[in-house]
């Protein structure tokens, strides 16, 4: 299959054999693709190598044969966000999530748009934690494993003042005992879950609970094997708060 002048975001790049690269991209029309960029070493290929960087928005042409395609041409369409600190780690995170959870060639039209929006939020450092929660929700919904965030597993409307455990398969479950501090730590309020359902940033400090709740759900769908970016973010935060 010939793919011509398709736009995409570069997710990941790694060496492939001696002089080539394996480039993972996210497209609107074809989903996630793995493309082999051959012979990219040397001065004449500097422009191409510069375009094949994570977060870069590109236009490319390729020949798709089987699992991996052959990249024929690529050019940068803008300047990729220059990130540092937590925003840089957040970009690693969203890219790793896509690589681990979204299979190649799966239709992800809405997720492509969500990625574009999240990329711009990273550029402006706009409500970083909230932006990541929205993107996580978009991934779950795209994969068909999302859940109703307006009602609990029994169909009862969420109580904004109550706390809920996010079950990966059934959705919110009301926390029945406030005495289990360990379980309570990994819960989110009905208020913040309803805000997530309506994609309206909440006026609350409960985003940490939402982060832990969503991580538990994602870990289930990751088969119990965590992300390298989670480890990097934890190490960064520890270093950042150390004297």
Swiss-Prot record:
Could you give one GO CC term from the UniProt record? bacterial nucleoid
**Signal peptide stretch:** none
UniProt KW DNA repair keyword: yes
Q: Which InterPro entries does the entry link to?
A: ARFGAP/RecO (IPR037278), DNA_rep/recomb_RecO_N (IPR022572), NA-bd_OB-fold (IPR012340), RecO (IPR003717), RecO_C (IPR042242)
- What's an example Gene Ontology biological process for this entry? double-strand break repair
> Which keywords does the record carry?
DNA damage, DNA recombination, DNA repair
Role description: Involved in DNA repair and RecF pathway recombination.
Q: Which family does it belong to?
A: Belongs to the RecO family.
Q: Record's PANTHER family?
A: DNA REPAIR PROTEIN RECO
Q: By what name is this protein known?
A: DNA repair protein RecO
Organism, per UniProt?
Xylella fastidiosa (strain Temecula1 / ATCC 700964)
């Amino acid at each position: 299959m010939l793919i011509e002048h398709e736009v995409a975001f570069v997710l990941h790049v790694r060496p492939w054999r001696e002089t080539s690269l394996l480039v993972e991209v996210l497209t609107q029309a074809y989903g996630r693709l793995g493309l082999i960029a051959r012979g990219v070493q040397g001065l004449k290929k500097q422009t191409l190598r510069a375009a094949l960087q994570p977060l870069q928005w590109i236009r490319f042409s390729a020949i798709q044969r089987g699992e991996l395609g052959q990249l024929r041409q690529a050019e940068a369409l803008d300047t990729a966000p220059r990130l540092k600190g937590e925003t840089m780690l957040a970009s690693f995170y969203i890219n790793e999530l896509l690589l681990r959870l979204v299979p190649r060639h799966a239709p992800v039209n809405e997720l492509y748009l969500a990625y574009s929006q999240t990329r711009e939020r990273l550029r402006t450092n706009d409500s970083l934690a909230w932006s990541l929660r929205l993107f996580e929700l978009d991934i779950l919904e795209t994969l068909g494993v999302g859940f109703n965030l307006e009602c609990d597993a029994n169909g009862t409307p969420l109580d904004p003042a109550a706390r809920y455990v996010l079950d990966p398969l059934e959705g919110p479950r009301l926390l029945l005992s406030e005495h289990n501090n360990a379980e309570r730590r990994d819960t989110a309020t009905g208020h913040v879950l309803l805000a997530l359902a309506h994609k309206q940033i909440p006026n609350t400090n409960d985003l940490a609970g939402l982060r832990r709740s969503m991580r538990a759900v994602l870990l289930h769908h990751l088969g119990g094997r965590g992300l390298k970016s989670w480890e990097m973010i934890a190490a960064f935060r520890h270093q950042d708060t150390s004297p």
